[in-house]
A protein has these predicted regions:
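Beta-strand-rich modules
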Residues: 369-399
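Proline-enriched interdomain boundary motifs that mark the N-terminal boundary
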Residues: 307-316
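Active-site neighborhood of glycoside hydrolase catalytic domains
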Residues: 72-82, 86-172, 176-226
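Substrate-binding cleft of secreted/luminal carbohydrate-active enzymes
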Residues: 183-209, 224-304
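Active-site-adjacent "subsite" loops/lids of carbohydrate-active enzymes
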Residues: 2-5, 11, 17, 27-87, ...
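Aromatic-lined substrate-binding rim segments of carbohydrate-active enzymes
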Residues: 1-31, 119-146
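Conserved aromatic anchor
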Residues: 322-336
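Extracellular low-complexity, O-glycosylation-prone stalks/linkers
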Residues: 334-357
Length: 410
């Protein structure tokens, strides 16, 4: 820690490159305030910010946190985010649920001196929320100043507020909530357009007596303010002895079936990826063969940009028997960079606009933004097909369809 690797390599650059090679997006996941995970056990370099600016930090439990009420500490975090967006081609900045820390029974977060210095006329609860609001606004602004295409997302704890505290809250009985305990007013951030998506951590099961998956799923679907929602699934729980319902092979499939009843819920995120190494409950096979059997495009965010890339350029189209071969190049005109191409396959003679939004029609997603050569079969097992290609821009907006049978001159 505190020293560059020898021989030098950049882990973040490596991760982004390998992610993009696979047609995936890279969302840089950050904890906004947590600075030292376990006091006495975490190895901290001499030049670490906690050593250089100890007055910026507060000790709570066995962890050290940036003081959310310290403006210099806030600016440091904002500058880190700005640096990432400026120097690396990330697709999004993603904040974890740790804003003010989860409460420890019998211990008050030690920010009384910071509150007194602030001179705020707000009560301490509202002052804490205003501190978190301030850093969210500043991070959002910094991201968009550096690159308007980079998104800003939050992965909040499952409950914004319980209904017994606020009629806008969810039908839940969470012991701690975003608004009242972590001082994270997620709904405000969505409403004010400070963030682009939320990934609520719905890590408990269907029918839970206090925080039921199905109730929170419906609540978040109604409170997105037009932004994207990706549901967080707690698949790690299959390995917990006390999580009996997560040992049921039907739990995750049932969650996905419920999720897909809400058109404004765009997808899922799983915590954590290492759980899939064990193929829990056979879910790897179930997901691959049933729920995710077709390729999918990341949904575009219209409030960022609706601009389409120009259509791809096809050349050297040739037919030999039932095989058609051709070359694809990125468009030579237009201001929208291309990240990939999509090849669609339709039954010959079918009206394509009725099928374009069905993932089963995606033949392949080709992550070669500089172009590629391709050969396709126009007839297989007696069925005839027609192919079309689109270019996909950085905000996941597709170009117009180009039929493969037509040669588009450069």
């Amino acid at each position: 820690q505190g020293k560059a690797p020898v021989p030098f390599w950049d882990p973040l650059a490596f991760m982004i490159e390998e992610t993009h090679k696979r047609g995936m997006e890279f969302h840089a996941w950050l904890n906004p305030y947590r600075a030292v995970h376990t006091i006495g056990k975490s190895s901290i370099a001499a030049e670490h910010i906690t050593k250089r600016k100890p007055e910026w930090f507060l000790l709570y439990g066995d962890k050290k946190y940036f003081d959310p009420g310290n403006k210099d500490a806030q600016q440091f975090v904002v500058n880190v985010v700005r640096d990432i967006v400026k120097r690396y081609p990330v697709d999004a900045i993603h904040m974890d649920d740790y804003f003010y820390p989860y409460r420890i029974a019998g211990k008050e977060f030690p920010d009384a001196a910071s509150y007194a210095r602030s001179g705020s006329t707000l009560n301490k609860e509202d002052w804490r929320r205003s501190n978190v609001d301030s850093i969210i606004v500043a991070i959002s602004k910094a991201i968009k100043e550096e690159n308007k295409q980079v998104r800003f997302g939050i992965s909040p704890f499952s409950v914004w507020r319980n209904q017994d505290k606020d009629p806008r809250g969810s039908d839940s009985r969470a012991g701690q909530t975003n608004y009242d305990d972590l001082y994270a007013d997620i709904l405000l951030w969505l409403e004010k357009d400070w963030i682009d998506y939320v990934t609520p951590q719905l890590y408990l099961e269907i029918g839970h007596d206090k925080i039921a998956y199905e109730k929170l799923l419906e609540w978040w679907s109604k409170n997105a303010f037009g932004k994207h929602i990706y549901i967080g699934h707690g698949i790690y729980r299959f390995d917990e002895r006390t999580s009996v319902k997560w040992k049921n092979p039907a739990e995750l499939p049932n969650q996905l079936k419920l999720l897909r009843q809400y058109p404004n819920v765009q997808g899922s995120i799983y915590f954590s990826s290492k759980s899939f190494d064990k193929n829990p409950n056979g879910w790897n096979d179930s997901l691959q063969n049933n729920y995710y059997k077709y390729p999918a495009l990341v949904p575009s965010m219209d409030w960022i940009s609706k601009e389409k890339p120009a259509a791809p350029v096809l050349s050297r189209v040739a037919k030999k028997g039932e095989e058609i071969s051709f070359s694809v190049k990125p468009p030579s005109a237009g201001n929208v960079p291309v990240k990939c191409f999509v090849i669609y396959r339709f039954p010959a003679g079918r009206f394509i606009t009725t099928l374009i939004n069905q993932p089963a029609t995606i033949f392949s997603i080709v992550v070669k933004p500089n172009g590629f050569d391709q050969a396709l079969q126009q007839r297989e097992k007696g069925d005839a097909y027609q192919y079309y290609i689109t270019a996909v821009g950085m905000n996941n907006v597709e170009s117009d369809l180009v039929p493969v049978t037509t040669v588009v001159k450069e």
